[in-house]
Amino acid sequence: VAGMTKPTVPLVLGLWFVLQALPGLTEQADDNSTPSLLAAFYGNTLAEAIVLKNPRFVAAIQAQRQKNDTLPSPLTQNETLKMLLLEETPWVLSARNENERITQLAELLDRAKCVKMQYRALTKLLALQNDDGGFPWKKGMGSNIEQTLSVLECYAQLYTQNLLGDNESLVRLRSEAINFLNKKIAGDTARIAQTEKLSNSQLRYLVLQTILATPLSETEGAGRTMLCEKAEKGWKSFDLEGKALTAQLLYRTGNQEAARRIVNSLLGYATITDEEIWWQNIRSNRNTLGDIRLHTLLMNTVALVTPHNAQLAGMA
């Protein structure tokens, strides 16, 4: 297309993988499950954004659906890439053939359907939120800090990309959920005082607080200050996830020099070749995220703290 830069092969591959993974995210296997509904809300919100921002691409997918021939897929042509992706996204090859995948994508990139499914997932998700503001694993269970963190992290990611409108229900969800975390994490000053090494959940909360910037009570404010001090002093003992979260926290709170030191430390653990950069010890790290999500966290941290880092291209 005139005036457009020719996309690179990694970009095309990445876009193809993301698009083929979205149908798996938008499926709602369990309306009583926070993770399932959260994935459906997130996936349909992203799909709607793709429809709005890439009308020509959507038109091309719809046109391809009308044809009998198949669209060559980099996924099926590269065994190494296929195996890496399928370890955590097995639904990508669940379709019997490429034509079926194109059909799935065409159905996914239907804005009316996206909006309908997005609304349905949000309505069900709001119904799962407990009176204390937290989210359970399943309907009827008590509020869980990890699940509540996941919901707010999803919200924050969509919010910072301007993909969420002025929805009163979402504002209420955010307010009640962050208040739950404020009380459970920052408000527990006695536990914080006795804690030598912060958990990744505490660090995830601190990063969320810098993004959402919600009011804290006097006790919660004191607890947050204690947590931040412990994070800055103890980051060297954290795992990769903890180091990345601490770097984001320090960067967002104005301590950019310390954040850069942590990023340099993270890069010291990486395997660097002429073309690629990755962390081989992710699997042995016993991270609370999946391997792909942890790599993404590390990559995003490097991009946030050192946006002009020449090594970023090798991480994608």
PLM-predicted stretches and their roles:
Residues 1-316:
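Large, well-folded core regions of big proteins
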